[in-house]
C-alpha cells in the first residue's frame, strides 16, 4: 500500500527486464570470471604472457589502454586446481592526458580557469591485480580482483571477490 515502495520495486525490476540490463549488472563479474581463458598455454617455468589490453577509464567512458601480464603461479599438489595471476597497468601517458582532459571539461562546466599543462606531469598509477584458483574442469572456484589507484597523496583500493561453492 506504500506508493513509494511500489515505485521503487517497479524501478528495480526494470534492471532485470532484459538480457542487456542483466549483462550490464554483472559485466565486471563476467569479465573477471573469463579473464584467463584462451590467452596462452602456461607452465610454471614459462615467462609471463604479456599483451596490450584495455581497462576501465577513471575519467571518462572510453577504455584505458593497458599492458597485461598473465602467469601460472601454482599447480595444486593433487593437480586438480591451479592458480593464475595477472597484473594490468594503465598506460601512464594516456592516463595523464585523460586526467588533463577531465580537468579541462570540469573547468569549462564550472566556468573556472583551465588547468595548467603541468597537470600532465601528475603521477597517476592505476593497476588491477587478479588472482584466480581454477579447477581442472576450467571452473573458477575463487577469484579476487584488486584495483589500485595511486595519485598525489591518495591511495584508492577496491576489491572484488567471488567464490563458487559446491
Where are these regions (language model features)?
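Solvent-exposed N-terminal domain segments of exported/luminal and surface proteins
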Residues: 1-10
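Extracytoplasmic beta-rich ectodomain segments of secreted or membrane-anchored proteins
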Residues: 9-83
